[in-house]
Regions:
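Long, non-globular targeting/processing and low-complexity regions
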Residues: 1-104
């Protein structure tokens, strides 16, 4: 996606918004940095159950780890190897599919 840079709009950004322009330009990095520690905490939580799509807690935690791995890769990098792209795709697919199961 091409960035449209208007000097007036970027100079006064922080005066008009509650977050830095860099967090908006790199929204997926920002979201990944926000999501990773929460998924890690959720995985470590002594949960009372697991997503019904999985056979047990171990399998559910494995899926959560795949989500974590995907977001870890997306926290800072801009380019990815083919293996990293597959890891990201798999983790994001799991995150999307099981988003509403991320509760206890």
């Amino acid at each position: 996606m091409a960035k449209l840079r208007n000097k007036d709009s970027t100079e006064n950004w922080s005066h008009k918004n509650d977050y830095p322009i860099e967090e908006v330009w790199n929204t997926y990095h920002t979201l990944a940095r926000f999501i990773v520690p929460r998924l890690q905490a959720f995985k470590a939580l002594e949960k009372h159950g697991y997503c019904p799509d999985f056979k047990g807690m171990r399998e559910w935690n494995c899926a959560i780890q795949k989500m974590i791995d995907a977001f870890e890769l997306m926290k800072y990098a801009n380019t990815y190897s083919e293996d990293e792209k597959r890891t990201i795709e798999q983790g994001l697919d799991l995150f999307r599919k099981h988003f509403f199961n991320l509760w206890d």
